[in-house]
Amino acid sequence: MNSPWNIASEFDVDMSFTAEDIAGMLRDYEADCRTGMDISSIAELIYEYTSGYPFLVSRLCKLLDEGAFHSGKLKLAGGVWTEPGVQEAVRLLITEKNPLFESLSNKLGDYPKLRNVLSELLFEGKNITYNPDDEATDMAVMFGFVRICDGYVVVANRIFETRLYNMFLAGREMQETEIYKAALHDKNQFVQNGHLNMRKVLERFVEHFDELYGDQDRRFYEEDGRRYFLLYLRPIINGTGNYYIESRTRNMERTDVIVDYCGEQFVIELKVWRGNAYHERGEEQLAAYLEYYHLDRGYMLSFNFNKKKEIGVKELRIGKKMLVEAVV
């Protein structure tokens, strides 16, 4: 069956759709198909994941149109053209093989400098200034993997970002680490009646991380701590859930991970310890961020190189929000 979302080739990033462009296409589709979707909210959601990258917009909409994943659970949630439907389409898209992602992977293999820049951006949260004379950053822009925002290089969209994280984390070297093996061993204990127990995920991660890497120096905590948490998390949610990084809050001290799992959402702030005052500000920032996501519970994982730190997991109430704090 021909789909209105079929397109033959990818577009350049400078041809990106706006949220209103996407809404216009959805209005035309809705006039024909009458799905009952909330056009404005679905258009905004698709834009949030794709930043308007035309191939990704079209591919997501095609997955939704085909409804190949229209399980009973999604029917109860109101159909595929809903937030859970879009999240499931995103999960399928991120895990599929297509020419766009193959090109992205091949470019990383062909250009080591490009790979290094993207790794620093993703895992270390470095602020990389765009310099047209720098081969690696200029190449990243030319290929459409990143865009320029206020003079800095940022990954072009959430879908690219998650796919890139997965590419880095799926390398043989990463999958031979002890923390990854621990996740594979633990993964069946975290889901109860379809619900992901994020507190237990943090508790087990803290135990493993302290045992494996507790004697590492400050540089390790700053550069590799967040990488190892994502490496631990990924096999636990793989096949059912998805994650992405909130690029607006990512820097060298802080990374916010958003996890979608069976209709539930979790916000986990990963941060490098910078003292009590900075930590308390971080708690308040996370509480405010939970308000934005309409969540009552959030999670914080601090990588603390202080030898006198108190390792473990505890709960703390900030206003009306409950924070689950883990320290390694």
Ranges and model annotations:
Residues M1-S9:
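Short regulatory helix/loop adjacent to the ATP-binding pocket of P-loop NTPases
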Residues E10-F11, T18-F143, C149-D150, I179-A183, ...:
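Winged-helix-like regulatory helical subdomains adjacent to P-loop NTPase cores
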Residues V201-Y244:
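Acidic-basic catalytic patches of nuclease active cores, encompassing PD-(D/E)XK
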Residues F229, V257-V259, G263-R274, Y289:
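Conserved catalytic cores of phosphodiester-cleaving nucleases, focusing on short active-site segments
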Residues P235-G263:
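Active-site metal-binding core of divalent-cation-utilizing nuclease and nuclease-like domains
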Residues H279-E283, L290-I318:
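Nucleic-acid nuclease catalytic cores
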Residues K314-V328:
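Intrinsically disordered, low-complexity terminal regions enriched in charged/polar residues
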